[in-house]
């Protein structure tokens, strides 16, 4: 299940950008300052917009997802700005003047990937595995920068979170698209962390009864299991180091699939 993030909330229950940026684990002070400037720019551009809160929230979610993958600061800034560009709150030309060409190039690459919706058959069940694989290959061929694909995966996860309370047909449509295209794409790229979260949400939306049944059988919450694994991995690493064994040790909780 999805980890609950609260590091960016202050005592009054309000969003605290300084606290949020500090929680992302960005080592460079300059990078933190640039992200703070980008956040301020997003606030300015969305002022008075009816969907301001939603667009800002979506960008925050995407940045948090990408920060767990230790993506560079340009990727994080592009992710924060992407919802605004995608909703045409601010044009790419204006962004190019404000934040630079490199970030706009990333945003443009992510937006180009939306064209794939015209090629996949998530509205029905007639799509073949060969067609789906062709779509995935096309996605990879459409972008010149790997970071665009990773941002798109983060955007799809944010979307799946967003439609949690939406009508069933909207949830199912989003889940089918991610099941057919984006979860396998994350797997092909070796980004297991994003693949597991995509699959968790898709299973929840496509098979709600089974999801609830399995969830009920799991006595440990995912966060508890993650904490247990972290402790176990730490202990195992220490023991292996004491024995002079050089090895990489890692673990993860199983998903519901």
Language-model-detected regions and their locations in the chain:
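Active-site helical microenvironments for divalent-metal-assisted chemistry
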Residues: 1-257
């Amino acid at each position: 299940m999805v980890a609950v993030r609260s590091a960016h909330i202050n005592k009054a229950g309000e969003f605290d950008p300084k606290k949020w940026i500090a929680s992302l684990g960005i080592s460079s002070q300059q990078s933190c300052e640039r992200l703070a400037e980008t956040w301020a720019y997003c606030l300015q551009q969305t002022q008075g917009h009816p969907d301001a809160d939603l667009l800002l929230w979506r960008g925050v979610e995407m940045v948090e997802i990408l920060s767990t993958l230790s993506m560079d600061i340009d990727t994080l800034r592009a992710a924060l700005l992407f919802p605004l560009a995608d909703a045409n709150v601010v044009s790419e030309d204006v962004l190019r003047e404000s934040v630079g060409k490199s970030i706009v190039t990333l945003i443009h690459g992510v937006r180009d990937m939306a064209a794939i919706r015209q090629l996949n058959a998530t509205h029905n069940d007639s799509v073949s595995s060969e067609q789906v694989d062709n779509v995935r290959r096309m996605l990879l061929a459409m972008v010149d920068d790997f970071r665009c694909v990773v941002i798109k995966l983060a955007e799809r996860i944010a979307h799946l979170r967003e439609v949690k309370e939406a009508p069933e047909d909207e949830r199912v449509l989003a889940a089918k698209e991610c099941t057919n295209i984006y979860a396998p794409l994350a797997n092909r790229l070796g980004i297991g962390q994003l693949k597991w979260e995509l699959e968790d949400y898709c299973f929840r939306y496509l098979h709600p009864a089974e999801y609830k049944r399995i969830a009920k059988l799991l006595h440990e919450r995912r966060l508890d299991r993650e904490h247990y694994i972290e402790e176990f991995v730490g202990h195992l690493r220490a023991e292996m180091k004491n024995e002079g064994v050089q090895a990489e040790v890692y673990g993860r909780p199983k998903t519901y699939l």
